[in-house]
């Protein structure tokens, strides 16, 4: 599974976590039960989001300007959490993370949402 596919699985896992209020370990097991190979990166990202969720949301909220994190859809929240944890906590290359997040937004969100995702992650 390449990194884009891993990020897609993570977006789905984070979405389930946010929407269904499931335990993060239960979400990981649900994804794993789909016969997918889940690697250390997957677990590291989920654990880091779980451990720093409030801090990440605060930083996202600051970058949203006239918007509020809670008003965003769960998919948008999931993409922003994924991107923010990779940029702020895991120190991945910001340009690559933003590009991947924009791709996910173009595939799974409303037409113009990718611009919001791009702008927020760029400000982090």
Residue ranges and their predicted role:
Residues 1-124:
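N-terminal interaction/assembly modules
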């Amino acid at each position: 599974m390449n990194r884009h596919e891993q990020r897609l699985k993570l977006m789905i896992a984070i979405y389930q976590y946010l929407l269904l209020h499931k335990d993060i370990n239960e979400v990981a097991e649900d994804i794993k039960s789909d016969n997918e190979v889940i690697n250390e990166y997957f677990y590291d990202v989920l654990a880091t989001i779980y451990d720093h969720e409030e801090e990440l949301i605060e930083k996202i909220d600051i970058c949203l300007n006239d918007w509020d994190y809670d008003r965003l859809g769960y998919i948008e929240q999931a993409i922003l959490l994924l991107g923010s944890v990779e940029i702020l906590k895991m120190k991945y290359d910001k340009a690559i993370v933003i590009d991947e997040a924009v791709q996910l937004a173009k595939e799974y969100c409303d037409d113009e949402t990718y611009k919001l995702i791009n702008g927020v992650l760029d400000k982090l």
